[in-house]
């Protein structure tokens, strides 16, 4: 069983879609299928479909250090969330996470906050493990596992910006990821705290673009979950002490795939 960690996020990643190699020889696929059947007994139809296919398809980020980052040299996805994908694949195919990785039983596809939902809904991927914040609204569309990470949204600013707190952001430009929950979380927080802070928001397609735009001072602040921001801290910027919109990440599956959802939840819990 994978212990639930203390991590979460509001934002999205890049649009890279390079997938790990998925070809396996017939012997490997047959062995994996047999081992999975022995381990799981009579599998649910949605899980059996993955076993028969011979690979678990997972949507992940490609630009979030520590969570999921695509190695530009090897094309491999590396990080906590990718390791979790191998743990789940091991459960499905009746092997260890290391064996699942060695046998390439996970096919990764890079997703963003904007693309991860549609890819899951149209069946191109089986799971989303991509800093996907659990909300009541999203639970109406997807199955979510027990949370595996909890965090709060943060604010990254340049050292020479003169911005020292959220109150200094009135009239400033805040960059956020497309389809993230950051903007709504920020707005709700300042209303709750009765702060007179009305910034302008600009949406971007990925975190590297946000970091670059902050560095070139085209925006005044880069806002997303603090754990994600930590991967973009350097000598010229810092994260403000303010934190808001605490949230939880979960593994998402299509609403109809209840067997897969149950298997994932048991593994994550």
Label every PLM stretch briefly.
Residues 86, 98-168, 236-243:
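Acidic, polar ligand-binding/catalytic clefts
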Residues 40-44, 48-128:
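Extracytoplasmic small-molecule ligand-binding "clamshell" domains
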Residues 26, 35, 39-41, 83-84, ...:
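Extended ligand-binding regions for polar small-molecule ligands
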Residues 62, 149-160, 226-268:
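Periplasmic-binding protein-like
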Residues 60, 64-65, 77-95, 133, ...:
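Bilobed "Venus flytrap"/periplasmic-binding protein-like clamshell domains
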Residues 115, 129-141, 185-189, 212-246:
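A ligand-binding cleft/hinge motif common to bilobed small-molecule-binding domains
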Residues 88, 120-121, 169, 213-215, ...:
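Hydrophobic residues within well-ordered alpha-helices
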Residues 7-19:
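Bacterial lipoprotein signal-peptidase II cleavage site
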């Amino acid at each position: 069983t994978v212990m639930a960690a203390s991590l979460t996020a509001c934002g999205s990643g890049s649009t890279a879609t390079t997938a790990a190699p998925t070809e396996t020889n017939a012997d490997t696929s047959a062995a994996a299928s047999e081992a999975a059947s022995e381990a799981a007994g009579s599998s649910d139809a949605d899980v059996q479909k993955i076993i028969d296919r011979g690979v678990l398809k997972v949507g992940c980020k490609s630009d979030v250090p520590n969570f999921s980052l695509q190695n530009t040299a090897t094309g491999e996805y590396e990080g906590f969330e990718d390791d979790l994908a191998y743990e789940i694949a091991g459960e499905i195919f009746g092997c260890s996470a290391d064996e699942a990785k060695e046998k390439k039983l996970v096919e990764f596809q890079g997703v963003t906050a904007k693309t991860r939902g549609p890819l899951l809904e149209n069946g191109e991927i089986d799971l989303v493990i991509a800093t996907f914040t659990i909300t009541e609204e999203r639970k109406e569309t997807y199955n979510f596992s027990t949370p595996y990470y909890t965090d709060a949204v943060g604010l990254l600013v340049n050292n020479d910006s003169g911005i020292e707190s959220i109150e200094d952001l009135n009239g400033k430009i805040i960059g956020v990821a497309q389809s993230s929950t950051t903007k709504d979380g920020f707005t709700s927080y300042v209303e709750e705290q009765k702060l007179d802070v009305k910034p302008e928001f600009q949406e971007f397609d990925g975190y590297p673009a946000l970091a670059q735009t902050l560095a070139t001072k085209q925006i005044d602040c880069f806002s997303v979950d603090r754990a994600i921001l930590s991967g973009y801290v350097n000598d010229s910027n810092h994260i403000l002490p303010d934190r808001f919109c605490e949230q939880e990440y979960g593994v998402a599956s299509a609403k109809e795939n209840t067997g897969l959802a149950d298997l994932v939840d048991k593994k994550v819990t």
